[in-house]
Amino acid sequence: MPIYDKSPRPQEFAAVDLGSNSFHMVIARVVDGAMQIIGRLKQRVHLADGLGADNKLSEEAMERGLSCLSLFAERLQGFSPSSVCIVGTHTLRQAQNAADFLKRAEKVIPYPIEIISGNEEARLIFMGVEHTQPEKGRKLVIDIGGGSTELVIGENFEPRLVESRRMGCVSFAQLYFPGGVINKENFQRARMAAAQKLETLTWQYRIQGWNVAMGASGTIKAAHEVLLALGEKDGFITPERLDKLKSEVLKHRSFNALSLPGLSEERKAVFVPGLAILCGVFDALAIRELRLSDGALREGVLYEMEGRFRHQDVRSRTAKSLANQYNIDREQARRVLETTMQMYEQWQAQQPKLAHPQLEALLRWAAMLHEVGLNINHSGLHRHSAYILQHSDLPGFNQEQQMMMATLVRYHRKAIKLDDMPRFTLFKKKQYLPLIQLLRLGVLLNNQRQATTTPPTLRLTTDDSHWTLCFPHDWFSQNALVLLDLEKEQQYWEAVTGWRLNIEEESSPEIAA
């Protein structure tokens, strides 16, 4: 037997979940097509504790988060950017100064941090459970985090109902248990508040129904472990066992005094509010039994990344679904996409350092979906389409990707207002502004909505934001309307400082000879 195994090293992936209470990292490798977890790291950061009444993260909370990321960065040395995904959840969604934290994080960990929506978080949690649990049939998945609670019903890797509610064990500790005081009144108020937050979805979830309910969070794991320590051998959570836990909890006067078998010291400060939320969820949905799941958000992120490597990108399904929903003209979308990518390839060859794989994918989807707002009104098409893309639930897209797609579409026609554009942390202006220029030209050259408009020999030359489009000889004699559109487009470009669009025709072959 050879001493050295010369087979290629398995692809490794890392998923990092920046939660409101703890930061988690899980590292896995793909062996024979299966995901194998090879390491986990968890740090309690209490990020949500640092979120003030003004919705700004305190300096202390930021320091705790950055210190943890520095620790994670050590373990991630040598990982390629495409193999690492870091997601921010509720607290970073809420924090008005999240961009400041992300800017400082860039210096600590060399991978982008994606802030995901509550619904996207819920979808990824569900996928993490689906990939890691043997139970078959329709599942209800519940995750009680530090700042939000996610609830999903789905089956066979397809979420059917997806919801995220702003209630978590850290936020409820501050709201309903001031000073860490435990009493019957505080617990009941928290329980009722949780049930009330689910009021609008109760019947929808009950009617959909489920075969098995799974819990995927620190709160549910802690309840499971306390029940095991109290002698409940299967650790399943039932209404009767929740009453038992509640009775045990109410024997104590404060979080600090809390002493339950199986409850870790670090969980004391958030166990009681988490338990109250869990009771409220049971009340609202009439749950009879809840089982603990090993998989959660970070596992969902891992499988999502691995799926993209196998070209099973959920975002493509999302884009197709949206195209169907708004009945877009697929032939026109295809024409715009082909023209835009024809020019993108030329731009990329001239500006390779500015090209970004994620942005290329977003440009493709923006080209495909730029007319989703056509059903509302043609005159404000760009604004309507951008609004739909920005405010729709788009599985697979993080908040910045969704905003970027909306921005590309918002400025694909009419005036260009750079000052009105949102701030991005994952992408730089010099990377995405050329994509706006490309999409504008891709749409303009297909204004006639005919297959013959864009010449196959169209040449694009770029020098920073000074662009030249060169058309075949005598092409404009057959396409006078396109020339008029291009001349109008030149005026839009001239209104932007530093932008210039030159239009040329190749010289006559006779002259060249």
Swiss-Prot record:
One of its GO terms (molecular function) is exopolyphosphatase activity. Keywords: Cell membrane, Hydrolase, Magnesium, Membrane. One of its GO terms (cellular component) is plasma membrane. It comes from the Bacteria. Its cofactor is Mg(2+). Its main location: membrane. InterPro entries: ATPase_NBD, Exopolyphosphatase, GppA/Ppx_hydrolase, Ppx_GppA_C, Ppx_GppA_N, PyroPPase_GppA_Ppx. CDD domains: ASKHA_NBD_EcPPX-like. GO terms for biological process: polyphosphate catabolic process. Belongs to the GppA/Ppx family. Degradation of inorganic polyphosphates (polyP). Releases orthophosphate processively from the ends of the polyP chain. This is Exopolyphosphatase. The lineage of its organism: Bacteria, Pseudomonadati, Pseudomonadota, Gammaproteobacteria, Enterobacterales. The gene is ppx.
